[in-house]
Amino acid sequence: MINAERSYWERALYEQEYDLIVVGAGLTGQSVAHFFKKDHPDSRVLIIERGSFPIGASTRNAGFACIGTIGEHLADLEIESEEKVKTRIKERFQGLQLLRSVIGDENMDYIHSGAHEIFTDKKEFEQAAKSIDRFNGWMKDLIGEPVMYSETVYNGHPAIKQTQEGMLHPGKMIHRLIRLNMELGIEYRWNTAVTELNEEHSSVGTATGMKLKAENLVLATNAFTRSLLPGIEIQPGRGFVFVTKPIKNLTWKGTFHFHKGYVYFRNIGNDR
């Protein structure tokens, strides 16, 4: 590694103070930077990412755009208040509308496919089906959709169809957001691992010894947060995404949910 002393010009360019530094270039971090810059056009905003591209969950998921199934809502109501569950549903819906307006459906291959919640247990299906009218009433009040859920059958399985769901390409979504942010004048530092966070002096230190200061710091590193803030009790949960080999005459098309939303699957193209 070359440890050459920086020139006057380099120091003027790279060692100045920012109005906002965001650590983590996933969807959350880039969105924070995006809206901060739009609200403060003259501000200097920097996003720091340890990889050559975002390496967290933002681009390592199944590409669902959903606000929840009846099975999921019922499971949530067993451990949370009705008010909290309703708030989350409304915020999910509003967040998806905002995402689509910022990114553009065509820029992330968004398909408004609707969805099906699949059941293999008769009692679970009957319990969920009894709640259709209840949750349709919720959706009318929360998102203006009076008939979101309906009873049906899919590929021989009892199911509940829902209208407000879609699928998208997470990689294209993030790529588009990067382009938009660069057009706004937001700076990026790729392959830059932040190893130190100084809240008192509002600065971060990198693995290469660089110190960067900002009036505002945002840590948007999700599962990696404990490496910078070991005192915070964050335990990441591991999820798995499996991509099948090509399947001839694939009949499962759309987005599907199973087991109270803990298992979900979708098609990719016509044969996966």
Give the positions of each predicted feature.
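Extreme N-terminal leader/targeting segments of oxidoreductases
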Residues: M1-L20, K38-D39, S43-R44
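Glycine-rich Rossmann-fold phosphate-binding loop(s) that bind the pyrophosphate
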Residues: G24-Q30, R50
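Glycine-rich, N-terminal phosphate-binding loop of Rossmann-like dinucleotide-binding domains
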Residues: A25, T69, T221-N222
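Glycine-rich FAD pyrophosphate-binding loop
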Residues: K37-R60
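Active-site substrate-recognition segment that forms the wall
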Residues: H40, R50, G63, E106-I111, ...
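Glycine-rich active-site loop/strand segments that organize a redox cofactor
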Residues: G56-E91
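Flavin (FAD/FMN) cofactor-binding and adjacent substrate-gating region
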Residues: G71-L77, S101-R179, L184
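Helical element adjacent to the flavin cofactor pocket in flavoenzyme catalytic cores
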Residues: A159-N216, A220
